[in-house]
């Protein structure tokens, strides 16, 4: 019988929210600086930095680019929960990035406070040429202070 990497600890983490963070209020300046950095050396689209232009756009105000991350410059570093135990060279400790998918919903606007929470939504195993592989799918969900969904990301980690 082949080993299993899905422990009771992994099963207990399924659908349990962890690593909850709240951003400080997002400012127009935060959005503008992010857009300049992302689009450099080109000029970013006006909806990200020109309040007059943005007021007459479909959004009605300045909005952040999809990739904007209000958690990118934390004051205090936090260690995220490591699923599946330590990373090393032994079987079950090796990790591959299995990719991610992101869906965007309501745009981030100046004044928004973003809440991020992560949960393990699926854990399964397959046997491949590397032997037993455990697939862990985590969901990172962002909402704003009104409870509106901003972004949902699904990340796959593979342990073998």
Short names for language-model regions:
Residues 1-15, 99, 103-160:
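HotDog/MaoC-like acyl-thioester-processing domains
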Residues 1-99:
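Hot-dog-fold acyl-thioester-processing enzymes
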């Amino acid at each position: 019988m082949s080993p299993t990497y899905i422990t009771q600890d992994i099963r207990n983490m399924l659908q349990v929210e962890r690593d909850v963070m709240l951003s400080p209020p997002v400012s127009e300046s935060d959005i503008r600086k992010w857009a300049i950095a992302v689009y450099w050396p080109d000029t970013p689209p006006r909806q990200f930095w020109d309040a007059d232009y943005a007021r007459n756009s479909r959004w009605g105000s300045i909005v952040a680019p999809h990739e904007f991350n209000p958690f990118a410059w934390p004051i205090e570093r936090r260690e995220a929960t490591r699923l599946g135990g330590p990373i090393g060279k032994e079987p079950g400790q090796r990790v591959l990035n299995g990719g991610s998918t992101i869906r965007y919903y309501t745009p981030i606007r100046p004044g928004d406070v973003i809440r991020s929470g992560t949960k393990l939504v699926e854990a399964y195993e397959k046997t491949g040429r590397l032997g037993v592989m455990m697939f862990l799918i985590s969901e990172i969900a962002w909402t704003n202070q009104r409870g509106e969904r901003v972004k949902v990301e699904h990340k796959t980690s593979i342990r073998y």
